[in-house]
Design a protein with these regions (language model features):
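Glycine- and acidic
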Residues: 151-155, 159, 216-222, 331-334
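Conserved, mostly hydrophobic/aromatic
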Residues: 24, 57, 92, 134, ...
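Glycine-rich phosphate/ribose-binding loops and adjacent secondary-structure elements
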Residues: 163, 175, 179, 186-305
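C-terminal extensions of enzymes
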Residues: 1-18, 26-32, 41-42, 146-152, ...
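Non-catalytic, usually N-terminal nucleic-acid engagement modules in DNA/RNA processing proteins
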Residues: 1-182, 296-299
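Structural signal for hydrophobic packing residues in well-ordered secondary-structure cores
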Residues: 138, 169, 173-176, 180, ...
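Short, ordered coil/turn segments that flank beta-strands lining enzyme active or ligand-binding pockets
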Residues: 22, 287, 357
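A non-catalytic, amphipathic alpha-helix used as a structural packing/dimerization or gating element
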Residues: 129, 133, 160-171, 204, ...
């Protein structure tokens, strides 16, 4: 895996680059649609690739571990063959789901004991078992196993949690170096920088992960309830320390404005469920602001969903029709909204990349942030 830094914005920390994987090139900055169970909910892979123009998608280790399970995935030849997605893929380590969805029943030095949210069965995730699981899934980029504490954690707990994450990280890399890919393509392992909202803990974590000389680095534990300005401050603290020649991934973030502000602070990769989850509930993102398509004002608006959009749904369907589908809870409404939103996110980062290359990212970003904050 190779990351090439191609352009730097003269008036911010924004960067444009290329990440070479065995499944293709990813041009950064990039947004990664979330395909939790090896599918971006409600959208054909063909449309994710060709209409939304996604270059890389994300899948979730916790969910794939429980269903379909590692035996099925290994017999299928890994997640790429199983799902037929032939582009780059990233798996998170499942730590967020273990600590939230499943409910971590017992957190120990060895790992986390938890119960399946599906059938209540008991399981144990350790740094070693998570690396083994991610090897079996076979994504191009794997994430280290860590603890993601609440954003408002007291300092003593945040420090204790970070120390555990650092010990787990060492075990993750030991296991990673002891094992090999199962399906013939290279797999990178990204460490995750934690530290809650404490600048000194974030700085310590960023310094610590540098020792692993990883292919890339992730920033976790943000957008979990802390004020937005604090999130931006933590990004600045971390990115001032992380190596400049490696990609930086901000996990689980966020709104279109968050993404532009993250790019301005030197982030290269993003993922978030917002475009699909919020789309299913009637929130439509556009370059002129946000639409709640459930509102009555759209019931007789026969204009296209987004005249500037790049996906076919933006021009074929009207706001009135999407309003009707959403109110009636028709599956097609969720599909249209999800595809539009993902395509919008991808168009946004593509435009950001173009402006970074042109040297005028900052004034463009400021204009976009002003528009994106509007409620239409």
């Amino acid at each position: 895996m190779k990351f090439t830094l191609q352009h730097k914005d003269p008036s911010s920390q924004a960067r444009a680059g290329e990440l070479q994987t065995d499944h293709g090139v990813v041009k950064t900055p990039i947004f990664m649609p979330v395909g939790t169970a090896a599918t971006v909910k409600g959208i054909f892979h063909r449309d994710v690739r060709d209409e939304a123009r996604a270059q890389i998608i994300l899948a979730n280790t916790y969910h794939l571990y429980l269903r379909p399970g590692m035996d099925i995935l290994e017999r299928a030849g890994g997640v790429h063959r199983f799902s037929t997605w032939d582009g780059p893929m990233l798996t998170d380590s499942g730590e967020l789901q273990v600590f939230s969805l499943a409910g971590c029943r017992k957190l120990k030095e060895e790992g986390c004991h938890f119960q399946s949210h599906i059938d209540g069965s008991r399981h144990l995730f350790t740094p070693e078992s998570v690396i083994d699981t991610e090897r079996t899934i076979g994504a191009d980029i794997m994430m280290a196993f860590d603890e993601c504490p609440p954003g408002d954690s007291p300092r003593d707990y945040a420090a204790k949690s970070l120390a555990l994450t650092e010990r787990w990280l060492d075990r993750c890399f030991n296991r990673y170096r002891q094992t090999s890919p199962k399906y013939g393509h290279y797999q990178a392992l990204f460490p995750i920088v934690q530290g809650c909202t404490y600048p000194d803990l974030r700085a310590r974590a960023a310094e610590n992960v540098k020792q692993y000389d990883a292919d890339g680095y992730a920033i976790g534990g943000l957008a979990v309830g802390e004020p937005t300005d604090v999130m931006y401050e933590m990004i600045e603290v971390v990115n001032a320390i992380l190596p400049e020649d490696r990609p930086r991934y901000l996990m689980g973030v966020g709104t279109p404005i968050n993404i532009l502000e993250g790019i301005a602070r030197g982030v290269d990769m993003f993922d978030c469920v917002m475009p699909t989850r919020n789309g299913r509930n009637g929130q439509i993102f556009t370059s002129e602001g946000t639409i709640n398509i459930r509102n009555k004002k759209w019931e007789d608006d026969f204009s296209p969903i987004d005249p500037e959009g790049t996906a076919f749904v933006d021009h074929v369907y009207t706001k009135a029709y999407l309003h009707h589908l959403t109110i009636c809870q028709e599956m097609l409404g969720a599909q249209i909204a999800s595809l539009h939103n993902i395509a919008f996110y991808l168009r946004l980062v593509t435009e950001a990349r173009r402006h970074i290359g042109a040297g005028d990212f900052t004034p463009w970003k400021e204009q976009m942030v002003a528009k994106l904050g509007r409620r239409l």
